[in-house]
Amino acid sequence: MLTFLIPTAKEMTTPKESHPHLLPQDSQAILKIMTAMTTEDLAKSYRIKEEAAKKEQQRWQDMASQQSLAYPAYQLFNGLMYRHIKRDKLTTQEQAYITQQVYITSSFYGIIPANHPIAEHRHDFHTRIKIEGQSLKSYWRPCYNQFAKEHPQVISLLSSEFDDVFSKDCKQLWISPKFMAEKEGQFKTHSTISKKARGAFLTACMENNCQTVDSLKSLVFAGFYYHPDLSTDYEFVYIKKEA
C-alpha cells in the first residue's frame, strides 16, 4: 500500500462539518508557547502585520480555553494544492483512500491522517520558536522518523521545508514526484505548476486506486504524463506540454 505525505497550507476555508477540538499531547507544549506570545511577538515570528497577528493570537487563545472547533484537515486547508485535490462527492473507495493513505505533515499537530480534525491556526516550520530548547524541526524529528519507519514506501509531495525534519536514513525508499512544463524542448518548473500538479496527481491516484509504485507510471492527469528518461527510481518526473 502506498502512503502519501502532503504539507499544510496557510490559506484556509471553514467547512460545514465540525468537531470538538482535541489536541495531541505533543502539541500541548507548542500551544503553551504560542498563547504566551504577545501580538508583537507573533507578528515578528510569523513575519506578518500586527493586525493579522491579532487574529492569530485570538485563535491560540481560543484553543487554550477549549473554545475552538475542529474541522477535517484536508477540507480546512485551502491552498493552491488543496484546491486541486478532489474533496467533494467522493466515492466510497476515494474516501477510504484519502483517509487511510494520505497524511498531512504539520509543525503543530505532527503527522496526522488527512481527515484528522484540527482547529484554524497558522503555524509552520518557519515559525521562530524554541520548545524545550529545541527548534521545531528537532522537536518533531523523533515523531516524524517513527512514522517513516512504520511507512517505508512513501510518496512525498512535501515542499523543501520538510527536507531536514526527517532523518536522511528514514527516506531511502521514498519517491518524490516532480512536475515540469515543456515548451519548445525546454523544461521548466515553478511553484504554481508544482502546487497545482501535486493536487491533480493525488486526485488521479485516488480515482485510479493506485496501490503500487508501477501504477504511478501509467497516470495521466491535467495534461501530465510520466517521463521515464527524466525519472529515477526515487524521483518520478511528470511532463506537461505547453503550446
UniProtKB/Swiss-Prot annotation:
Protein name: UPF0246 protein M6_Spy1787
CC per GO annotation: cytosol
Family the entry assigns: Belongs to the UPF0246 family.
Pfam families (alphabetical): H2O2_YaaD
Lineage start: Bacteria, Bacillati, Bacillota, Bacilli, Lactobacillales
BP GO annotations: response to hydroperoxide
